[in-house]
Curated annotation (Swiss-Prot):
<dbReference type="InterPro" id="IPR004161">
    <property type="entry name" value="EFTu-like_2"/>
</dbReference>
<dbReference type="Pfam" id="PF03143">
    <property type="entry name" value="GTP_EFTU_D3"/>
</dbReference>
<comment type="function">
    <text>GTP hydrolase that promotes the GTP-dependent binding of aminoacyl-tRNA to the A-site of ribosomes during protein biosynthesis.</text>
</comment>
<feature type="domain" description="tr-type G">
    <location>
        <begin position="10"/>
        <end position="204"/>
    </location>
</feature>
<feature type="binding site">
    <location>
        <position position="26"/>
    </location>
    <ligand>
        <name>Mg(2+)</name>
    </ligand>
</feature>
<feature type="binding site">
    <location>
        <begin position="19"/>
        <end position="26"/>
    </location>
    <ligand>
        <name>GTP</name>
    </ligand>
</feature>
<dbReference type="InterPro" id="IPR033720">
    <property type="entry name" value="EFTU_2"/>
</dbReference>
<dbReference type="InterPro" id="IPR005225">
    <property type="entry name" value="Small_GTP-bd"/>
</dbReference>
<dbReference type="GO" id="GO:0003746">
    <property type="term" value="F:translation elongation factor activity"/>
</dbReference>
<dbReference type="GO" id="GO:0003924">
    <property type="term" value="F:GTPase activity"/>
</dbReference>
<dbReference type="GO" id="GO:0005737">
    <property type="term" value="C:cytoplasm"/>
</dbReference>
<dbReference type="InterPro" id="IPR041709">
    <property type="entry name" value="EF-Tu_GTP-bd"/>
</dbReference>
<feature type="binding site">
    <location>
        <begin position="136"/>
        <end position="139"/>
    </location>
    <ligand>
        <name>GTP</name>
    </ligand>
</feature>
<feature type="region of interest" description="G3">
    <location>
        <begin position="81"/>
        <end position="84"/>
    </location>
</feature>
<protein>
    <recommendedName>
        <fullName>Elongation factor Tu-A</fullName>
        <ecNumber>3.6.5.3</ecNumber>
    </recommendedName>
</protein>
<dbReference type="InterPro" id="IPR004541">
    <property type="entry name" value="Transl_elong_EFTu/EF1A_bac/org"/>
</dbReference>
<comment type="similarity">
    <text>Belongs to the TRAFAC class translation factor GTPase superfamily. Classic translation factor GTPase family. EF-Tu/EF-1A subfamily.</text>
</comment>
Length: 394
């Protein structure tokens, strides 16, 4: 079977459904695919094909995730849906499924539930920038006042976690009604699609961001100087650009005097490409794996941060025993391990394999970081956890 050519004509946006178990996330995902296929063309997907989510492994963590795609006249969406609560936690923390926006599904019959809060908190911690609410099962509630009450509660809950609760779109609908072809509920799915188009801004493309390349290797070339290699994460590196070497040691500035790819000289390297960058006047021992090459001033080195962490279960090859405060593993950022100590939240004495937990990490050497940076927790090269930088402290 030949792969269909991917059309690059429309902006591409990543979204996903979040919310409490059994509130209708997967039904809504199926309804969006089905209704939009009917209205705008595209491929319909039924509930069963989405619910039967394939197992994926991201950094050694097993996650069940379904990926579907759909189109509106203006955009192409990639949408992720997870069957279980644990899958959401893992997905959001590892960044396996990056979201430019989330669709929070809340059943009108239940209102806000524990996982509603947890997913909003996780969304805030891992940096999901925009949330749209779909109040589901509204066909099962006759009382208009009850619907208003649920909407108000959800808006308040979102505001509590610094989302603009008063202003974000809330759509009252019925995913099942829409799946069954009932016109009034199909219209609500179209309304949701329009909200996605207007409320979630077009994400900035990696190539348009400030230049950053994690350094994987360092070579010195006789008569030419020092070359660092790596895959450009974002932005563009042009010959003649001033760059900063950030992390582990003092930040130093230098100039890139050459860019090469597959032994050919180029004028520039772009996001996604593996390149070698020749650095002017830099000695081989001044640069090491684990540092980054970046546009000066665009990223700073830090040692202390608050993070959201998922600890691998024993079945995933993680620890067999809990850990306590004073635990000192390695934290693997981009290309290297750095030892660090942890502080657990008040009232948390120990962390069990399979848990997710908020912790403050203090590294022994600074790493170039932004909020939203992912890392792995390792013991002797074996991954035992995954995390994301939620807030930089120092």
């Amino acid at each position: 079977m030949s792969k269909e050519k991917f059309e690059r004509t429309k902006p591409h946006v990543n979204v996903g459904t979040i919310g409490h178990v059994d509130h209708g996330k997967t039904t809504l995902t199926a309804a969006i695919c089905t209704v939009l296929a009917k209205v705008y063309g595209g491929k319909a997907r039924d509930f069963a094909s989405i619910d039967n989510a394939p197992e994926e492994r991201e950094r050694g963590i097993t996650i069940n995730t379904s990926h579907v795609e759909y189109d509106t006249p203006n955009r192409h969406y990639a949408h992720v849906d997870c069957p279980g609560h644990a899958d959401y936690v893992k997905n959001m923390i590892t960044g396996a499924a990056q979201m430019d926006g989330g669709i929070l599904v809340v059943a009108a019959t239940d209102g806000r539930m524990p996982q509603t809060r947890e997913h909003i908190l996780l969304g805030r911690q891992v940096g999901i920038p925009y949330i749209i609410v779909f109040m589901n099962k509204c066909d099962m509630v006759d009382d208009e006042e009850l619907l208003e009450l649920v909407e108000m509660e959800v808006r308040e809950l979102l505001s509590e976690y610094d989302f603009p609760g008063d202003d974000l779109p809330v759509i009252q609908g019925s995913a099942l009604g829409a799946l069954n072809g009932e016109a009034q509920w199909e219209a609500k799915i179209v309304e949701l699609a329009e909200a996605l188009d207007t409320y979630i801004p077009e994400p900035e493309r990696a190539v348009d961001m400030a230049f950053l390349m994690p350094i994987e290797d360092v070579f010195s070339i006789q008569g030419r100087g020092t070359v660092v290699t790596g895959r450009i994460e974002r932005g563009i590196l042009k010959v003649g650009d001033e760059v900063a070497i950030v992390g582990i040691k003092e930040t130093v500035k230098t100039t890139c005097t050459g860019v090469e790819m597959f032994r050919k000289l180029l004028d520039e390297g772009r996001a996604g490409e593996n390149v070698g960058a020749l650095l002017r006047g830099t000695k081989r021992e001044e640069v090491e794996r684990g540092q980054v090459l970046a546009k000066p001033g665009s990223i700073t080195p830090h040692t202390k941060f608050e993070s959201e962490v998922y600890v691998l279960s024993k079945d995933e090859g993680g620890r067999h025993t809990p850990f306590f405060k004073g635990y000192r593993p390695q934290f693997y950022f981009r290309t290297t391990d750095v030892t660090g100590s942890i502080e657990l939240p008040e009232g948390v004495e120990m962390v069990m394999p399979g848990d997710n937990v908020k912790m403050v990490v203090d590294l022994i050497a600074p790493i170039a970081m932004d909020e939203g940076l992912r890392f792995a927790i390792r013991e002797g090269g074996r991954t035992v956890g995954a995390g994301v930088v939620a807030k930089i402290i120092a």
